[in-house]
Design a protein with these regions (language model features):
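Skp1-binding F-box subdomain of Cullin-RING ligase substrate receptors
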Residues: 1-118
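Amphipathic alpha-helical protein-protein interaction segments
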Residues: 7-18, 27-37, 125, 147, ...
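Eukaryotic intrinsically disordered and solvent-exposed regulatory patches
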Residues: 9-12, 30-32, 115-119, 138-142, ...
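Intrinsically disordered, low-complexity regions enriched in proline, serine, glycine
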Residues: 34-38, 47-49, 53-57, 140-144, ...
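Cys/His-rich Zn2+-coordinating "finger/knuckle" modules used by eukaryotic regulatory proteins
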Residues: 113-173, 299-300, 305-307, 312-331
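Catalytic cores of histone-lysine modification enzymes
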Residues: 167-276, 281
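Generic structural signal for buried aliphatic residues
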Residues: 195-201, 293-300
Length: 331
């Protein structure tokens, strides 16, 4: 009897150890790997199902202020969510073997504990900033906006903190959003509440690339019809007028919910704004509402001028000005 009791106790401990390990390892699996292990046992099937449900409930993995769920109304579609690595801010190039947990039980708690990542990838040593305690008025020297859709905010060289009124883009998403799948366009980002004109929506986050690397990747993406790229190129014209700074952000593999914003040939309802912060070396690309946006309305912007290509991807924006083909960066 004692021997049988010992064996049962040992088996229970073994099972408990297995499930603890599974809870740690399985969130790192991609959808194909998750589907494969779910077929091996009832227990792993339930674990995989739970992880899928958590992934569907929040694309941001708890990194944003509000959950951003996936909603798939296509009944015969087997993909309840889109798999990608998440970063709420700019990041450097990833290692090829990079993995990221998604769907663990305590992921949201860990994100809150660790806090939001520093939005400034590189800083300017010795840069001067404002001395304001909280820049809620128009007197802050950092506060500036112009007709070229360039905004200046307080940054790492300023005395104020994240609660400053001139740091609206640095605290993450503050409006309710959702991902909805369309039969033609695939996943798109939608407003889950009314968004007033001028409201900050989200940053365009992803890998910050050199122009050489961005050109190489774009040429690769052009050849691979199976990949839907999310490489954004924005050119900031310098005061001289005859030169420009090119900003290349690739959210194809790692990015945030901005990677799901689809193109609209009529310009869409979002403005692409270059945001510079005092003491930060590099600007950030952010989306602001260009007009009032209604609840359940899709968020869109213009990818740029149409470049006619024989193998160009079709456009399904459905606007009266639709050109029938998506813009593509001229490399």
């Amino acid at each position: 009897m004692e021997e049988k009791h010992y064996e049962k106790t040992r088996d229970r401990r073994s099972d408990a150890g297995f499930f603890r390990c599974a809870a740690i390892v399985i969130p790192y699996l991609n959808p194909a790997e998750l589907a494969a292990i779910s077929c091996t046992s009832k227990s792993l099937y339930q674990i995989s199902k739970t992880i899928t449900s958590r992934r569907t409930s929040d694309a941001s993995r708890g990194s944003e202020n509000l959950p951003i769920p996936f909603l798939n109304p296509i009944s015969d579609d087997s993909q309840p969510y889109s798999y990608f690595f998440y970063t709420p801010t700019q990041t450097l190039r990833l290692r090829p073997d990079f993995r990221q947990a998604w769907g663990s039980n305590d992921q949201s708690r860990l994100c809150r504990k660790e806090g939001r990542p520093d939005p400034f990838l590189l800083r300017v040593e010795g840069a001067s900033g404002c001395e304001c305690a909280s820049c809620n008025g128009d007197c802050c020297p950092c506060l500036e906006a112009d007709e070229f859709l360039l905004t200046r905010e307080c940054g790492p060289s300023c005395k104020c903190g994240l609660g400053c009124g001139n740091r609206v883009t640095q605290g993450g998403v503050t409006v309710r959003l959702k991902m909805v799948k369309d039969e033609k366009k695939g996943w798109g980002l939608y407003a889950a509440e009314f968004i007033p004109r001028g409201q900050f929506v989200c940053e365009y986050a992803g890998e910050l690339l050199s122009t050489k690397e961005a050109t190489r990747r774009q040429q690769t993406y052009d050849k691979l019809a199976s990949i839907t790229p999310a490489l954004l190129v924005v050119k900031e014209h310098l005061p001289s007028g005859n030169k420009c700074m090119r900003i290349n952000i690739d959210a194809t593999r790692i990015g945030n919910i901005a990677r799901f914003v689809n193109h609209s040939c009529d310009g869409g309802n979002l403005d692409t704004v270059i945001v510079r912060s005092s003491g930060a070396l590099l600007p950030r690309i952010c989306f602001f509402a260009s007009r009032d946006i209604q609840e359940n309305e899709e968020l869109t912007f213009s990818y740029g001028d149409i470049r006619l290509r024989p193998n160009g991807q079709p456009c399904f924006c459905g606007t009266a000005t639709c050109a029938g083909i998506l813009p593509s960066e001229n490399t």
